[in-house]
Curated annotation (Swiss-Prot):
<keyword id="KW-0546">Nucleotide metabolism</keyword>
<dbReference type="GO" id="GO:0009117">
    <property type="term" value="P:nucleotide metabolic process"/>
</dbReference>
<protein>
    <recommendedName>
        <fullName>Nucleoside triphosphate pyrophosphatase</fullName>
        <ecNumber>3.6.1.9</ecNumber>
    </recommendedName>
</protein>
<dbReference type="GO" id="GO:0005737">
    <property type="term" value="C:cytoplasm"/>
</dbReference>
<dbReference type="InterPro" id="IPR029001">
    <property type="entry name" value="ITPase-like_fam"/>
</dbReference>
<comment type="function">
    <text>Nucleoside triphosphate pyrophosphatase. May have a dual role in cell division arrest and in preventing the incorporation of modified nucleotides into cellular nucleic acids.</text>
</comment>
<keyword id="KW-0378">Hydrolase</keyword>
<dbReference type="GO" id="GO:0047429">
    <property type="term" value="F:nucleoside triphosphate diphosphatase activity"/>
</dbReference>
<keyword id="KW-0963">Cytoplasm</keyword>
<comment type="similarity">
    <text>Belongs to the Maf family.</text>
</comment>
<dbReference type="InterPro" id="IPR003697">
    <property type="entry name" value="Maf-like"/>
</dbReference>
<dbReference type="Pfam" id="PF02545">
    <property type="entry name" value="Maf"/>
</dbReference>
<feature type="active site" description="Proton acceptor">
    <location>
        <position position="70"/>
    </location>
</feature>
Length: 198
């Protein structure tokens, strides 16, 4: 089995990997995202995912696969990362309700053994419910939206406020499992190569 490192502290990403039999080594990158400037949201998540994976890869010398990810929600051309405050989360939800947005997740997979990197971006459309101000206030008070790109967690309380997903649901949670499989294949691996054997 090839060691698989997740360059993220995200519990949701870790759970997604565990669902498909991968128990990753968790090593958050602590990369300063503010240093990255990009012309488009797609370029931004691509660069951030790569920088996170490369930062963690520097601390490994043995063969391993390093996965870095970054997600943003795009609504009306505006990028919604994690909100800086409850007030910002409320304002964003007031803009998001009843709207359709795109959730973009950049994925960078580094194979240290081959010295190769694959970087791809997955986009999933999210249709939000027409939620009331009271529902928004209660949801933000739960604290959940403050830890999530786009101010919601599909796999948490926020799932009740999503009417429809067009695309890959796991991408909205933070990691496209079908895309991860394709990235592994492009580097010459299968899921079985990184799954923990019982």
């Amino acid at each position: 089995m090839v060691p698989f490192v997740l360059a993220s502290a995200s519990p949701a990403r870790r759970q997604l990997l565990q669902q498909i039999g991968i128990d990753p080594i968790i090593q958050p990158s602590h990369f300063d995202e503010s240093v990255i400037q990009a012309a488009t949201p797609t370029e931004l998540v691509r660069l951030l995912a790569r920088c996170k994976a490369e930062t963690v890869a520097q601390s490994y010398s043995a063969p391993a696969l390093i996965l870095g990810c970054d997600s943003v929600l795009v609504l009306g051309g505006e990028i919604y990362g994690k909100p800086a405050s409850p007030e910002m989360a409320i304002a964003r939800w007031q803009q998001m309700r009843g709207q359709t947005a795109d959730l973009l997740t950049g994925h960078a997979l580094i194979d240290l053994a081959q010295g190769r990197t694959c970087v791809e971006v997955e986009s999933t459309q999210v249709v939000f419910a027409q939620v009331s101000d009271a529902e928004i206030a209660a949801y933000v008070a739960s604290g959940e939206p403050l830890a999530c790109a786009g101010c919601f967690a599909l796999d948490g309380q926020g799932g009740a406020f999503v009417e429809k997903i067009v695309g890959t649901p796991s991408n909205v949670i933070g990691l496209s499992l079908p895309l991860l499989r394709r990235l592994l294949l492009s580097l010459g691996y299968t899921l079985a190569d990184v799954q923990n054997k019982k």
